[in-house]
């Protein structure tokens, strides 16, 4: 049973398509920091990357299929960003979530190392720790340093190695997890489908079946 102050983590992305590179590191992260709930936040209009190939409803369907296959029931979905016609700015979403969950509930946003390195380029990106913790999953080829020394000092003030601290305050900390680094990307999977190459082992079988049935990424 979930306590009233249990840490709730959100994981955003286009999920075009959702794959094991999304899921397995987050499952490992959940074990490291004792997450009882991870809520996927599919983007509608991502402001920092090309627009998705699959429609919002197709990406939502693939996410549902993927989490239904997982043995751990911690994953759920939040469709709010798919219902916005405007860009999916994370800070706007977390301002709304903070109002909903209240000032004392621990909230976290899961990102990859690549996203941490570009956080200063996000819309009000450095304001996020005022609203939530940041949980950072390792990514191949990236480190944890920011380009600017002042930004590195900003990062250092918020870093924690104590997973329990994430449960004891509502926001403000950055936890960098040594999760498994998987060289799986949605762009590579889309290219494989275009070129007729196999994608076995890269994404859940039910998602593969959906892609085939819908004729996606051809």
From Swiss-Prot:
Pathway: Cofactor biosynthesis; NAD(+) biosynthesis; deamido-NAD(+) from nicotinate D-ribonucleotide: step 1/1
Superkingdom of origin: Bacteria
Record keywords, A-Z: ATP-binding, NAD, Nucleotide-binding, Nucleotidyltransferase, Pyridine nucleotide biosynthesis, Transferase
InterPro entries: Cyt_trans-like, NadD/NMNAT, Rossmann-like_a/b/a_fold
GO biological process: NAD biosynthetic process
Signal peptide annotation: none
Known EC number: 2.7.7.18
UniProt GO MF annotations: ATP binding; nicotinate-nucleotide adenylyltransferase activity
Matches recorded under Gene3D superfamilies: HUPs
Cross-referenced Pfam families: CTP_transf_like
Reaction catalysed by this enzyme: nicotinate beta-D-ribonucleotide + ATP + H(+) = deamido-NAD(+) + diphosphate
EC class (word): transferase
Primary role: Catalyzes the reversible adenylation of nicotinate mononucleotide (NaMN) to nicotinic acid adenine dinucleotide (NaAD).
HAMAP family from the UniProt entry: NaMN_adenylyltr
Family designation: Belongs to the NadD family.
Name assigned to this protein: Probable nicotinate-nucleotide adenylyltransferase
Protein source organism: Sodalis glossinidius (strain morsitans)
């Amino acid at each position: 049973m979930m306590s009233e102050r249990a840490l709730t983590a959100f994981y955003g992305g286009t999920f075009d398509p959702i794959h094991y590179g999304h899921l397995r590191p987050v499952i490992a992260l959940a074990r490291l920091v004792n997450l009882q709930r991870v809520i996927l936040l599919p983007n509608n209009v991502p402001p920092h990357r090309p627009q998705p190939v699959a429609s919002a409803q197709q990406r939502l369907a693939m996410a549902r299929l993927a989490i239904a296959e997982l043995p751990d029931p911690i994953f759920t979905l939040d469709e709010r960003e798919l219902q916005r016609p405007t860009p999916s700015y994370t800070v706007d979403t977390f301002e709304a979530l903070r109002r909903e969950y209240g000032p004392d509930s621990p909230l976290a946003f899961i990102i990859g190392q690549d996203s941490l390195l570009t956080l200063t380029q996000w819309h009000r990106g450095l304001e996020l720790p005022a609203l939530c913790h940041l949980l950072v999953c390792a990514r191949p080829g990236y480190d944890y340093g920011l380009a600017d020394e002042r930004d590195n000092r900003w990062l250092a003030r918020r870093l924690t190695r104590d997973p329990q601290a994430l449960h004891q305050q509502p926001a403000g900390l950055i936890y960098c997890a040594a999760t498994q680094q998987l060289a799986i990307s949605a762009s590579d999977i889309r290219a494989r489908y275009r070129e007729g190459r196999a994608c076995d082992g890269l994404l859940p079988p039910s998602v593969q079946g959906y892609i085939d049935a819908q004729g996606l990424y051809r």
